[in-house]
Curated annotation (Swiss-Prot):
It is found in: Secreted. Gene3D superfamilies: 1.20.1250.10. One of its GO terms (cellular component) is extracellular space. Type II interferon produced by immune cells such as T-cells and NK cells that plays crucial roles in antimicrobial, antiviral, and antitumor responses by activating effector immune cells and enhancing antigen presentation. Primarily signals through the JAK-STAT pathway after interaction with its receptor IFNGR1 to affect gene regulation. Upon IFNG binding, IFNGR1 intracellular domain opens out to allow association of downstream signaling components JAK2, JAK1 and STAT1, leading to STAT1 activation, nuclear translocation and transcription of IFNG-regulated genes. GO terms for molecular function: cytokine activity; type II interferon receptor binding. This is Interferon gamma. It comes from Meriones unguiculatus (Mongolian jird). Released primarily from activated T lymphocytes.
Length: 173
């Protein structure tokens, strides 16, 4: 095992521990991965974090959802790269299921949509053209919404109408 695998497994462990709903089984699966990758704290302690340093910086801004998406994407790519490894497949599947439960609210449709976007080939000119064409709508969806509500004024209370107002006894005269 090279150092990169060890670091990635440790980061996976830390991310999974931070948000697991059923922590005990997931922690056991993470420990299994740590043993497989020999990723104890002493083995990977001299290296820089893979994703945690970025996550810490974003937490200061309070805007973590964007970076959470990137980190989850990273781990799903890692799981895909490790697919077929019988020694750790059970652990990876359990952790993947827990991430889906926590990040996608147990929605397979949301997970499938997320994965389909991750797999889009960005070097394809037709995809590039379609994506640029959709960009205005995407930017509109992502930008903060300004709620412009017109206030409706009641004409009955201000002399502008002759409707009865049940809350104003003077309007019945």
């Amino acid at each position: 095992m090279n150092a990169t695998h060890c670091i990635l497994a440790l980061q996976l462990c830390l991310l999974a521990i931070s948000g697991c709903s059923s922590q005990v089984p997931i922690i056991e699966e993470i420990e299994n991965l740590k043993r497989y990758f020999n990723s104890s704290n002493s083995a990977v302690g001299d290296s820089k974090d893979v994703v945690l340093h970025v996550l810490r910086n974003w937490q200061e801004d309070g805007d973590t959802k964007v970076i959470d998406v990137q980190i989850v994407s990273f781990y799903f790519k890692l799981f895909e790269a490790l697919k077929g490894n019988q020694a750790i497949e059970k652990s990876i599947n359990a952790i993947r299921a827990d991430l889906i439960a926590n990040f996608f609210n147990n929605s397979e449709a949301k997970y499938d949509g997320f994965m389909s976007i991750m797999k889009i080939e960005v070097n394809d000119p037709q995809i590039q053209s379609k994506a640029i064409n959709e960009l205005v709508k995407v930017m509109g969806h992502l930008s903060p919404r300004v709620t412009l509500r017109k206030r409706k004024r009641s004409r009955c209370c201000f002399g502008g109408g002759n409707r009865l107002n049940k809350n104003n006894p003077a309007s019945t005269i």
